[in-house]
From Swiss-Prot:
Origin species: Mesomycoplasma hyopneumoniae (strain J / ATCC 25934 / NCTC 10110) (Mycoplasma hyopneumoniae)
Pathway per the UniProt entry: Fermentation; pyruvate fermentation to lactate; (S)-lactate from pyruvate: step 1/1
Entry's family note: Belongs to the LDH/MDH superfamily. LDH family.
GO function term, MF aspect, one: L-lactate dehydrogenase activity
Protein name, entry field: L-lactate dehydrogenase
Pfam families in UniProt: Ldh_1_C (PF02866), Ldh_1_N (PF00056)
Enzyme class: oxidoreductase
Catalytic activity as recorded in UniProt: (S)-lactate + NAD(+) = pyruvate + NADH + H(+)
Primary site of residence: cytoplasm
UniProt-annotated binding residues for substrate: Q83, R89, N121, P122, V123, D124, D149, T150, A151, R152, T230
One GO CC term on file: cytoplasm
Key words of the record: Cytoplasm, NAD, Oxidoreductase, Phosphoprotein
């Protein structure tokens, strides 16, 4: 396997959490950091270099310019204005679309041909704006989508069912935000219907929205209200996406993907199950949704599509 080169654009808490997770998992041999503040990028690179001395394998970390992206395998983009306490992700849209468009053009001009992973919020809209501005293929532009929401859901279910999160198959789909929903009809534990665990967990089809969907959707706000930002969880989740692509696992994970007729929608980037492999998103998986879930999915699509369309008219 050839040495992997990963570039981070945006050296804030989320980006640094991803890079630290990636380093400790040995995902790449070379890392580069681009930030609007070159001194900040240098400082983080120096700090990561110091950390690398304790790793059992050699790596390099340095500040990059956009011209250094040409032979990178991955770009992880976290740059954008941060979310404020009490502010929804969708309120960030106008400022962060402007930022991502500028980044997309610089990335394209560099000759980059690898895989772009977008994390900046509101991620569904920002990923779409990046894809449109860059012209890169759907396969190679991946949003973090509801990958963190799904991890939170799996953890919550595992805790109630007294099993490992690795034994839980469950998805949060739709917008990474307030209109996301739990695909309750698809939840399984070790391949068995979640309904078999209703007595143990106290959760069934009549109360899952209160017991699972609502707490999972509010988790980010609970963290932000207490410590102003979330970053370790999403950093680890992005490292998991990158790891699955590098290792060509063909694992099914939730990610932000551009729909081309799947689930009956076109052109919207949204959190859905996908197959991850060496080419990025190798397939979008259309799981069966019940009528209630289909309605929630359509509502989520409509919300992010309207905001995107309104935003690009005014930028």
């Amino acid at each position: 396997m050839k040495p992997i080169k990963i570039a981070l654009i945006g050296a804030g808490n989320v980006g640094n959490s991803f890079l630290y997770a990636a380093m400790n998992q040995g995902l790449a041999s070379e890392y580069g950091i681009i930030d609007i503040n070159p001194d900040f990028a240098d400082g983080n690179a120096f700090d990561f270099e110091d950390a690398s001395a304790s790793l059992p394998f050699p790596i390099s970390v340095s500040r990059y310019e956009y011209k250094d992206l040409k032979d990178a395998d991955f770009i992880v983009i976290t740059a954008g204005r941060p979310q404020k306490p009490g502010e929804t992700r969708l309120e960030l849209v106008a400022d962060n679309i402007r930022i991502i468009r500028e980044i997309a053009l610089k990335v394209k001009e560099s000759g980059f041909s690898g895989i772009s992973i977008i994390v900046a919020n509101p991620v569904d809209i920002i990923t779409r704006a990046y894809r449109d501005a860059s012209g890169f293929s759907d396969q190679k532009v991946i949003g973090s989508g509801t990958v963190l929401d799904t991890a939170r859901l799996q953890f919550a279910i595992a805790k109630r069912a007294k099993v490992s999160p690795n034994s839980v198959q469950a998805y949060v789909m739709g917008e990474h935000g307030d209109s996301s929903f739990v695909a309750y009809s698809n939840i399984k534990i070790a391949g068995e219907c979640f309904c078999a665990y209703s007595k143990l967990t106290g959760i069934d089809s009549s109360n899952y929205e209160k017991e699972l969907e609502y707490p999972v959707s509010r988790r980010a706000y609970e963290i932000i209200n207490r410590k102003r930002a979330t970053f370790y969880g999403i950093g680890a989740a992005i490292a998991k996406i990158v790891s699955n692509i590098i290792k060509d696992t063909k694992n099914i994970m939730i990610a932000g993907a551009n729909l081309r007729g799947e689930y009956g929608f076109h052109g919207v980037n949204i959190g859905v199950p996908v197959v991850l492999g060496a080419n990025g998103i190798e397939k979008i998986i259309e799981i069966s949704l019940n009528d209630k879930e289909k309605e929630k999915f359509a509502k989520s699509v409509a919300i992010i599509d309207k905001i995107y369309q309104d935003a690009i008219k005014n930028i």
